[in-house]
Structure formats: structure tokens, C-alpha cells
Amino acid sequence: MREFLEETLQKIEAAGLRRSLRPLEPLGPTRALFNGREVTLFCTNNYLGLTHHPRVTARAQEALRKYGTGSGAARLVSGHNPLLQALEEALARCKGSPRALVFPTGYTANLAVIGTLAGREDVIFCDRLCHASLLDGCLLSGAKLVRFSHNDADSLRRLLNQHTGRRRFIVTEGLFSMDGDIPPLPEFYTLAQEFEAILIVDDAHGTGVLGPNGRGTVADAGIPAERIVISGTLSKALASLGGFVTGPGLLSEFLLNRARSFIFTTALPPVSAAAALAALEVLEAEPAILEGLWENVMRFRQGLNARGLPASGNSPIIPLILGSPERALRAAENLLEQGYYVPAIRPPAVPPGTARLRITVSAAHTPAEIDGFLNALGKALEEA
């Protein structure tokens, strides 16, 4: 085994793709200690900065004192608790769906919804740039997998005309995690209706960020949420841990009876459920936080434009594609030397030849942090 492991790791390293863990000690939503030095983070998914919001931390502490550190069992055994039930009701209201079902992670939620709904006689039409969890759900299902061009409704239509099966599914992200762009959801919904397909939208990065009161990309697109399937996470804008699926009323019942990644795993800890529930309440009670996020996004994108740097899209995720892993690593290391932490994103997380800096803006960033980072970024890209 040792020889195989060493040989594989050497190949990964030779391609500039070897990864390692870097311990960070959080100091707040956007700052951390790295090797004893304070750095500013422009890479987290903590879009609203709610991990340190007083209401969120207080509710988590209260749940910790009341319920302890873990759930102790699967939900169908003794792991279901009042906080999980309240969280599911709040998520259903947020998404405008009849019901929601919470999972330990967003990954397990996607495995469940696709891997359980689809089967060997079905066809799944999946965007080429969808997250690994969506692709793994497709492969797990055993259904025929057809990849359509990224965010391309014409490509999807052509393929829908070419491939038939018992049932058909259209799978996309609401806000793409690596490119920061949004698909034409109204067109996809129309195609789903026309071809009697089931539309599944992973709104992990749109939840809490887009749409009225942060209800997500489906609400932003004006699509009736009760007629499609939405998955998402609690670990990004909602400042906790976990995943969820919303959809027609019977979907939750179906998944809790059939989805292996729900049945055979320990329930989300009460402390995580409490934090996510509090974050949803903050979204409703403090709209200024979401407004602040978009003010920061605009400030950063305007700063990029002023420096002649690409700023496509309109979201808190800004990819600067540098091509080779080596160049992306050099740029990331230069930024770190200047006190900014933005790891290089390399294949297989992104397609070959598109290694990048994946920059994310948070509501918790200050104007001074944004302006300082813009100056540092210009220097890093020149020297990369």
C-alpha cells in the first residue's frame, strides 16, 4: 500500500495539485490567526458574518447547556428533537415550500434527494459545472447521466429532445460556488414543465444571499417553490452546519423512509440546529445585514473594474481565473505575505486550465479591509 500511496501523491504533487491542511484560529467572521499572524479572510462562505452574531451565538450556547454536545442517534431512533422540527418549519417558510427535511450536511442532502428520487430507468440532465455532491448523487442513482453546457438553456433543450426515460430530472445550482454565476432558472423551469421533468436546484450559496429577505435564487427568479425540489446548506450564510431539502409535501416522507444518507446517519446536533434557526430569524429581523453584504459586493466589484480586473457576474463570489495551478498558488502566497488569506482553487475542484482565486465578500468586511485587499490583489496578480 505504501508504494501505491507514495506514487499517487508524487503524481499529484508533480501536477501542482497536492493539498494540505492549514490550521486557522478564527478571530471573527473575517479574521483569523495563521502561524501566529493575523490575516484577513476573503475566501469564506460566511456571507453574512453571522457566525459571531450575538443572537446566533447566544442561541447556540443555550442549546448546548440544555441539550448537550450531540444528538446521540439517528433521527429515526432518538435523534429527532424540538429544535430540528422548528428548524424544518422555518426552512419551509423561508423557501415557500410545504415541508423541509434537515440532514447532517449539504452533501448528504444532495446524495439523498438525487440518489433516492432517480433510478436506473431515469435520465438526469446535470449542468457540467455542478458541485461534486450533485454529481455523486447522480452516479449513486444509477440513472443515465447527461451533462448540458453550463447555464445553457438551448443545450438543455436539445438534450431533452434527444434523451427519454421513465422520468427525467434537471439538476443545477442556484448560485454556482466556483464561478459565482446564476443559471436562467425561469427558462429551466419552463423546460421542466414542457418536458414533464423534475427540476432540482441546489441553493447552497444562494440561501441567505439572494432573493427577498435572502430566501434564495428560486424566490429571486419568481418560481413556485412548491413545484420543484430545492436543496441547500446551513453552513454558509446560515452560519452553522447541516443541509436541507424542500419540496412537495410527500417528498420529506419519501426521503425519511428511503434515503440511506438520512436513515443511516446521526442527526444534526441540537447546537447546530439552534444556530441555523437563529440565523433565519436574524435574516427576517435585521435586513440591514443583507443590504450591507450587497454594498460590500458593489464596492469590491467597482474596485476591480477601476483596476481593469475582470468582475463578471453579480454575486459575492468573484473568481479570478489564472489558468495554471502554479500561477494561482503564487498569487495566493503573495496575498498571504500581504496579510490576506485566499487559497488557490485548483483541479479537480475546477476544470483543468481554470485554476483561480475564488474571492468571497462578506457583510462583515469593512470598507478599509476591502480597499486594502484590492490594492494587495493588484500587486499579487502582477507578480504571479
From Swiss-Prot:
InterPro entries: Aminotrans_II_pyridoxalP_BS, Aminotransferase_I/II_large, AON_synthase_class-II, AONS_Archaea/Proteobacteria, PyrdxlP-dep_Trfase, PyrdxlP-dep_Trfase_major, PyrdxlP-dep_Trfase_small. The modification N6-(pyridoxal phosphate)lysine is found at K236. One of its GO terms (molecular function) is 8-amino-7-oxononanoate synthase activity. GO terms for biological process: biotin biosynthetic process. It is an enzyme of class 2 (transferase). SUPFAM superfamilies: PLP-dependent transferases. Pfam families: Aminotran_1_2. Its cofactor is pyridoxal 5'-phosphate. Pathway: Cofactor biosynthesis; biotin biosynthesis. It comes from the Bacteria. It catalyses: 6-carboxyhexanoyl-[ACP] + L-alanine + H(+) = (8S)-8-amino-7-oxononanoate + holo-[ACP] + CO2. Substrate binds at R19, H131. Its EC number is 2.3.1.47. Pyridoxal 5'-phosphate binds at G106, Y107, S177, D202, D203, A204, H205, T233, L234, S235, K236. Keywords: Biotin biosynthesis, Pyridoxal phosphate, Transferase. Catalyzes the decarboxylative condensation of pimeloyl-[acyl-carrier protein] and L-alanine to produce 8-amino-7-oxononanoate (AON), [acyl-carrier protein], and carbon dioxide. Belongs to the class-II pyridoxal-phosphate-dependent aminotransferase family. BioF subfamily. Homodimer. PANTHER family: 8-AMINO-7-OXONONANOATE SYNTHASE, CLASS II AMINOTRANSFERASE/8-AMINO-7-OXONONANOATE SYNTHASE. This is Putative 8-amino-7-oxononanoate synthase. It comes from Desulforudis audaxviator (strain MP104C).
